[in-house]
């Protein structure tokens, strides 16, 4: 079977440090650092990944690039008396992943659009960059698209903020089932955040 163009692009992005993507990324990051936190772009950087997540080159679909800080929640060690359990040094779980933060920021910048999905495009020592696919639920082209018109339903409002995207479901523990996930359903909050 003949591999498609998208297959070659996907292979190049699997190991970006070892392929031509590394040189392109070095040039791109210099430009991206000077741009704002949420930047609308003309076309996706990773066309294979965007299309697999639902992107189509048609009216009503917008792609934005978002940069977010890197790293976990650094916690300063208390210098006064504490119980070891209350120091919070061993593990501080973030409420949202870096990718979810990027999706929510894009959602707030474009309140009339809904987040479809997002994917990683680059990182340096300080920031991570994600591209977020946004859909206009009121656009007639989207309403007539049989693959995307589910976004027009009122139940799909605020997908990013409610954790209904792919990254959001993963962060809420909905990506796994069975043994070991007892504290993630019906929700993280219902189990007093013990599922994090």
From Swiss-Prot:
GO BP annotations, alphabetical order: cytoplasmic translation
Gene3D superfamilies tied to this protein: Ribosomal protein l15e
Stretches for region Disordered: 153-196
Annotated keywords: Ribonucleoprotein, Ribosomal protein
Pfam family, one: Ribosomal_L15e
A GO-annotated cellular component: cytosolic large ribosomal subunit
Matching InterPro entries: Rbsml_eL15_core_dom_sf (IPR024794), Ribosomal_eL15 (IPR000439), Ribosomal_eL15_arc (IPR020926), Ribosomal_eL15_CS (IPR020925), Ribosomal_uL23/eL15/eS24_sf (IPR012678)
Residue stretches of biased makeup (Basic residues): 159-172
MF terms in GO: RNA binding; structural constituent of ribosome
Domain of life: Archaea
PROSITE patterns, per database record: RIBOSOMAL_L15E
Family: Belongs to the eukaryotic ribosomal protein eL15 family.
The protein's name in its UniProt record: Large ribosomal subunit protein eL15
Organism expressing this protein natively: Methanosarcina acetivorans (strain ATCC 35395 / DSM 2834 / JCM 12185 / C2A)
Organism placement in taxonomy: Archaea, Methanobacteriati, Methanobacteriota, Stenosarchaea group, Methanomicrobia
Gene: rpl15e
